[in-house]
């Protein structure tokens, strides 16, 4: 097994469909570039349309023949997640790669439109709901994969209080 791995090692992705959440910057943008460069059809799932359009232009400028498109997705909204899944499923009959990358970190206390604490709602519940809504298509697509991107930030927390995920019974700490 090689000691290192790079974008050049990505096998041909022609004919494969990928969704990348949080594709407007950072790892999501670079993942979109890499997959498009390997021939995948990439759906960049982004919340902010202005940043998403700039990211789309970045991918197209770096990969001349990129098969890439934008779809709006706000993981802090179950309505947006349902709308995204419905639109995707109405336009595609396969999903080879679901890259759950979007996330927020160490933000002030806030709530999703459905009332969940923002970090739990966006980073965990949103991706869980999205994956669940796309699961049938993932299961029907031979060789499909789900990749959940995470960081080492969990090391800075005391752990999840499963009895108070919304910080209703204790003081909010953006690192918890």
Region locations from a protein language model:
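Rossmann-fold NAD(P)H-dependent dehydrogenase/reductase core
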Residues: 2-176
